[in-house]
Amino acid sequence: MKQCFFAVDLGATSGRTILGTFTPEGLEMEDVNRFPNHLIETGGHFYWDIYELYRHIIEGLKIVAQKKDVEITSIGIDTWGVDFVCVGKDGGFLRQPYSYRDPHTAGAPEAFFKKVARKQVYEWTGIQVMNFNSLFQLDTLRRNNDSALAAADKLLFIPDALSYMLTGEMVTEYTIASTAQLVNANTRKPEDALLRELGLTENNFGRFVYPGEKIGTLTKEVQRMTGLGDIPVIAVAGHDTASAVASVPAMNPDFAYLSSGTWSLMGVETKGPVITEETESLNFTNEGGVDGTIRLLKNICGMWLLERCRAAWGQISYPELIAEANASEPFRSLINPDDVLFANPADMEQAIQTYCSDSHQPVPQTRGQIVRCIFESLALRYRQVLDNLRTLSPHPIETLHVIGGGSRNELLNRWTANAVGIPVVAGPSEATAIGNIMIQALTAGTAKDIASMRQLINRSISLETFYPEDTDVWDTAYLHFKQVTMNH
């Protein structure tokens, strides 16, 4: 009977469940099921369908229950950050959770800073100010006299809501609460002063847990539905990026990571928060990591731009798009991927064209020109953020590890290496699921520490290294990029 770990890994556009097994050769993983995750738009708001996500998790567990040679040791859930469910006094969900893409938080930080100074909020939390942080979502709901929040007894972040559906136990996991901007970066506990401003207390949240702690076991109902026994559900790093960073296959500590998916998150691991005027002005974030680490990082708009264009273009493969981009003229048009114009436009291609027109650049017309514009702009934006990160990091940065789905994008990896001027190591692409499984394995005693797990991943997975080329050309392009994005 193989000892296996069941990982639930949910992103903003898709989800999957995965079985991970440790063998003498390393880590083996197999997909159980994959499924889309859609935004639902109704009544002028955007929601997630948490019941549909739960149904897919149950389906995955049913599939595994039918495998005769597999015994699940534990289950772990990670998801995207900041969104949450309002739970009533009777334990039921009061409505589907709002999505962070919902427009109702426009201007929300400024409204909150009238009550608590921006500087004070950053000193407590060390978290990058973004409209959709849970802190601002909650304050928006409160200002709007939202009926679900008014009736809520508990608030559960998405991974904690799903573990509650499986176990009946309500917890608040540290990494997901940290990215919400509700945790004090130094004490690593919820910041009471912020909760008070929201009309909340710690009693409105589940039991506070850290990665590696047990949440509970599958309820009798879930056991009956799936055919499984009383399997424990473990709090992994509930925030997908924290799980992904745990899996970085680094052999020495002098690295930066780029978790590349719908969002790109670039940062370094530190032993404690770095909260200074400089990190605040550059809007860097200090998010909770595994094993007592802090992830000093910045959010960058990632493959979202291409995902939205691709959805509009219909059936076209990535290899086709990349070939078209490769054949297009270099550095013809550049954009700031983080411009508010690209947050959630009705037509992403049109938004890119508008940006280029407004900044007096050639307007991309073909698919290849659009994709080339996105990739070159991302690579140059990565350089800009890495330059800032070097000044903030307590250690030198000699290598950039690209992990997550974007690590499979060979063209973008090559251009990123050219832009940043240091080697780029690509992989693993399933970083989040691997980190999720790693934390479960550490809890089960299968491995002794994070460092040895990283070495094991380095041995188990084929990694590709990209070395910088054409750096003079990219240096010139970077100056142009800074000029274009500064003036827009």
Model-derived features: where do they sit?
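N-terminal glycine/serine-rich phosphate-binding loop of ATP-dependent small-molecule kinases
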Residues: M1-R95, E123, Q223-V233, V420-I422, ...
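Active-site core segments that coordinate phosphate-bearing ligands/cofactors
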Residues: A7, T21, F113-T125, N131, ...
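Short beta-strand-loop/turn "lid" adjacent to the catalytic site in phosphate-handling enzymes
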Residues: T42, K62, K67-S99, Q128-F132, ...
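Stable alpha-helical structural segments in soluble proteins, enriched in small hydrophobic residues
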Residues: H56, G60-K68, C373, S377, ...
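Structured loop/turn residues at beta-strand edges in well-structured enzyme cores
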Residues: V70, G92, N203, P253, ...
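Short glycine-rich phosphate-binding loop at a beta-alpha junction
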Residues: V70-T79, K154, R207, L392-G404
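Glycine-rich beta-strand-to-loop/alpha-helix junction loops that act as flexible
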Residues: D78-V82, P211-G212, S260-W263, T399-S407
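Carbohydrate-associated surface elements
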Residues: D102
